[in-house]
């Protein structure tokens, strides 16, 4: 009886671990964000983004939802330019405040944006990513 109980407990643990492994989304190591293009700009719009470095801040649903704020925690995670999120790529003004603009996803003061989160961390004297234009965008 003890042997049967031990086997059932072991099977339950293996099943639980397998389900947990499936729940964690696969994270690409690096991503190139290149949805915007402005030939008149002095800086490149294309940005190399280390998804792996950001994923190291946490792999639970809440950590992913810090940036992927429309993700339900179960379905496939979409990028910022996904329809229904920041799909409008027509604005090149970093001061644009409408959340539908892709530029807003990266440059607003909100802690859900790249720049907003980095500045919030910098204010809290935590290790952070870039907060100035040329730190992300290369000169043309």
Curated annotation (Swiss-Prot):
Heme c 3 binds at residues 54, 114, 117-118. One of its GO terms (cellular component) is periplasmic space. Residues 1-23 form the signal peptide. Heme c 4 binds at residues 107, 133, 136-137. Ca(2+) binds at residues 34, 36, 44-45. The keyword Calcium applies. Keywords: Calcium, Electron transport, Heme, Iron, Metal-binding, Periplasm, Signal, Sulfate respiration, Transport. The keyword Metal-binding applies. One of its GO terms (biological process) is anaerobic respiration. Binds 4 heme c groups covalently per monomer. It holds the Pfam family Cytochrom_CIII. Heme c 1 binds at residues 51, 64, 67-68. Heme c 2 binds at residues 69, 80, 85-86. Its main location: periplasm. CDD domains: Cytochrom_C3 (cd08168). Exchanges electrons with [NiFe] and [Fe] hydrogenases and with the acidic cytochrome c3. Participates in sulfate respiration coupled with phosphorylation by transferring electrons from the enzyme dehydrogenase to ferredoxin. The second heme binding site has an unusual CXXXXCH motif. This is Basic cytochrome c3. It comes from Desulfocurvibacter africanus (Desulfovibrio africanus). The lineage of its organism: Bacteria, Pseudomonadati, Thermodesulfobacteriota, Desulfovibrionia, Desulfovibrionales.
């Amino acid at each position: 009886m003890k042997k049967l109980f031990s086997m059932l407990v072991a099977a339950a643990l293996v099943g639980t671990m397998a389900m947990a492994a499936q729940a964690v989304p696969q994270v690409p190591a690096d991503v190139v964000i290149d949805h915007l293009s402005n030939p008149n700009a002095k800086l490149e719009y294309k940005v190399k983004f280390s998804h792996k470095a950001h994923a190291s801040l946490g792999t639970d649903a809440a950590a992913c939802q810090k940036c992927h704020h429309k993700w339900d925690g179960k379905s496939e995670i979409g990028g910022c330019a996904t329809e229904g999120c920041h799909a409008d790529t027509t604005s090149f003004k970093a001061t644009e405040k409408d959340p539908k603009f892709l530029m807003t996803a990266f440059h607003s003061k909100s802690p859900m944006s790249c720049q907003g989160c980095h500045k919030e961390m910098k204010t809290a004297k935590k290790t952070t990513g870039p907060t100035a234009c040329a730190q992300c965008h290369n000169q043309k």
